[in-house]
From Swiss-Prot:
Residues 115-125 have a biased composition (Polar residues). Expressed in oocytes, testis and liver (at protein level). PANTHER family: EUKARYOTIC TRANSLATION INITIATION FACTOR 2C. Gene3D superfamilies: 3.40.50.2300, paz domain, Ribonuclease H-like superfamily/Ribonuclease H. It comes from Xenopus tropicalis. The gene is piwil2. The keyword Metal-binding applies. Residues 366-478 form the PAZ domain. This is Piwi-like protein 2. Its main location: cytoplasm.
Amino acid sequence: MDPTRPPFRGSPFHTPLGVRPPVLETKEEGPHGRAVLLPRGRALLGASAPSSDTTQRDPSDSRNVLPALFRGMGIETKPSGIPGRGGPVFGRGFLSTMSSGDGPDQPLSEPSIRPSLSTRVQQASDFSTERVALGRARFPIPPVSMEKPHVPTGRGLLFPSVLPTLTSDPVPKESPIATLQIEKEEKWEPLPKKGSKGSPCQLGLNLIKINFQNEAVYQYHVTFTPIVECRSMRFGMMKDHRSVTGPVTAFDGSILYLPVKLAQTVELESERRTDGQKIKITIQMTKILDPSSDLCLPFYNVVMRRVFKILDLKLVGRNFYDPASSTVLQQYRLQVWPGYAANIRKTDGGLFLLVDITHKIIRSDSVLDIMNILYQQSPENFQDEVTKQLVGSIVITRYNNRTYRIDDIEWNMSPKDSFSMSDGSKISFIDYYSKNYGITVKELDQPLLLHRPSERKAPKGKALDIVLLLPELAFMTGIPEKMRKDFRAMKDLTQQIHLSPKQHHISLGKLLKRIESSADAKNELQRWGLFLDTDIHMTTGRILPIEKINLRNNSFPAGEDLNWNREVTREACRSSVHLLYWAMIYPKRASAQAQELSSMLERIGGPIGIRVNHPNCVELRDDRVETYARSIKSLLEGEGKVQLLVCLISGTRDDLYGAIKKLCCVQNPVPSQVINTRTISQPQKLRSIAQKILLQINCKLGGELWGVDIPLKSVMVIGMDVYHDPSRGMRSVLGFVASINSCLTAWYSRVVFQLPNQEIMDSLKLCLVAALQKFFEVNHSLPEKIVVYRDGVSDGQLNTVENYEIPQLQTCFQTFDNYNPRMVVIVVQKRVSTNLYSTATGQFLTPQPGTVIDHTVTNRKWIDFFLMSHHVRQGCGIPTHYICVMNTANLGPDHLQRLTFKLCHMYWNWPGTIRVPAPCKYAHKLAFLSGQFLHHEPSIKLCDKLFFL
């Protein structure tokens, strides 16, 4: 740092109006919910609960009760009512205490500055009508009005009520527990999802079977008379009666879970310490649960979090890491922390602990080190460069292992500035870190990093605070941009991250041994009657039959590695379009490369059945965006017919690429090919690269490269995906691609722009009706069956797809007279934690492409399967999860699995299989191009071509 010019100091600092006091920090040990009750008059967004600890809960309260708790209570009350204060607590969060029975401790937070104007509105709760905060939550509270509710669109779809209807009468002093009846869960019947095609294979899964010692878990409803509104006071009263309930409890304020059976009704008495009032506590058994019940999963996951903490694993975000076992890449100044992403799931095979191996990349340089480097490189534009480099980055503070996003830099503040503690006393940042963490701050003139927490992380009853961090104590995470372009560096890093199946199994085995060798960890599990298997779960899967690839004059099996690059570059394509009238634009310094590429395309076109004429060459004086744009407009407006426009550009330039694509896809529609001169700069590789370019050009002109046998007749296959660009705040883009011929080799595409961050699509009718009309033009009939592959949907949105998107699709059929096709809708999930290991040879290897498993690990509520369709060269085999949410075509499991596998062969940008069906990949490419570069719907003239490849 330049001693004569402190680069970090700005204008004098003025003490902020509000300060959030630092308090001791603990992690909330329960799932976080979103569906909550709000009193009348309170805004649905940004409203704050009363500051007192009452039964009415704030949307930001992470300790809200799961709606599933009351769903299983069997409470029968009057219809259409409202709870008063102190009534049963509703919500989605769960269990702030476990076996300890203590209330939540105060968290130790970062020094933070509260905004001067509160973004929340506090209003006292009353007994009037409650409204519902709708969002991603799957179980919104039912409306209280008897009128038909308005159904909003988007993620917050209002589903039928799953909670007991509540009374609008004043709440009685005593809860009507006499109406509670003990009931047992209904038995579950497995869905018909197992296929039979293919050869069996032995598989290992990254699942550990959970076994039970207890026969049941007992659910109780706890009533306090008179009503005790303070939640922590209720925790304290229940803690006083551990001699009755036992040391192991899960209590959320009104619902109590125990591994032991009490009498049907237990009455206890406590004294309220604030006024000496005698409080009657009535514990009423409401349900006998199987130990593997869904209602038990939240506190089982809390138990596992405690086990990981006992093993001295550090919680960072949602995963646990082991910094003590980190690998240091000294030459790149990086640390790689190994860790585990674990959660308990109930599947068709029972209750399992799913453990995925994960890694956290931590840079050895602090944010302050990066600031010093930037200052040395550009002292004049120092602050601008720092803002450009750091804002939006994720940092970790090692003293508490928490991650933060940098939203801004406070140049006018330093560690010497002070803030107010909860008791009103002032303390500087220097003293705060020294007192609480024993850290001595060395750089006193450094600015502070600013982080704005999201609304859902706001403490109960408090406005959103601004977190301030010291650059000296914050470390960058992730891979540096410069390193991403270094092939050797990325190779060294991926060797540490992409573990082989054998290494995966060893890591999982080490975790199980650590749990087994820790008496405290085993005791934590046994308190709830849980114990784990000593190894991962083994089962049997299937390898689907190898598909046959069809070219124009030849057919051949795909082979074990599922790659047919040699065949498609030596034999004629299934259907080709001759390249007769095309143009090539390039800067003057790339003229030699342009001539070589043109000559090579003419030579290699013959074997693959494409005749290539000499192009109309346009040489540019420079490579500015304006020069390209002017030449392209002049060429396309002056020429009578141009089949294709090829542009050579130097380097990776998003601005130039976007300008070319806008001109060719929106303003003057023509298929275009943009080629980086670096790609064709090596003569020894030019032939193979030119072959790939020509095959891609053939697709863009409407040609077909290869196909597979499709036994289904009169079928349309649709792929849908959504692209989001949150960094730019642009609208979301829906990519829609549908097949329009019988062999699924011709495609029709459309794009729909949506509101920001809107995943559920609102404009399907426009796309599907246009696709059906195009299908009719080609085939002179409408499809009898429609198969939809919907990408980018999480488990929590499955019901929304079923209840909202599918009805939109079905309304399209009313456009045509007497048309009611059979329909299949399959959700495609790529981001899964399930790993497959082949154990056929006695060793843990990557499964063969075509490996499918449709049992054990599958979802109990849906017909689904996991398919490993692609060839993996490095790391573990991560399958793709397919969930069938609708099937009126009566396609069996074998039909669904084999059709999906066939479509994974049909992506023409790669002569092999890919992770998802081709229409999904096409939809993704289309949505990405439109959202990232075009920012507009492509011209309708290009809809029947794969112009977006």
